[in-house]
């Protein structure tokens, strides 16, 4: 258990190789040095976390429980994630995507295309995509790579849209 932590991906893997060595997704390196404040309980297979984290890519606030982290690609999770001006494009290596601010409830499994299957519901207050900053998005659906099925609504000054259907990202 810990309540305050200042570290990086490389430091964590070096300090706790038997606990975290093969469980942290490598894209977490992109967060750089981070400062985490809150309550976190961590074992080889389980995380219970309620924290706020400042990173090189932006702020993250989260309250979640994650099981089966010993096989992180298929880990299960449930909770809430808040991103504030977070550079999602850099984090996921997608050049058309930029910064995002959101508040989402999540319930699912997996972090890779092979295993990802997640229910998401919440608000995206701002999202930079293709050099435009969209505002006032709402989502409620299931994301199972490469398919999103559910509702999306956008109430942006340049786009008013309500969608209920399926999107194939291939």
What is the predicted role of each segment?
Residues 1-170:
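Interface amphipathic segments
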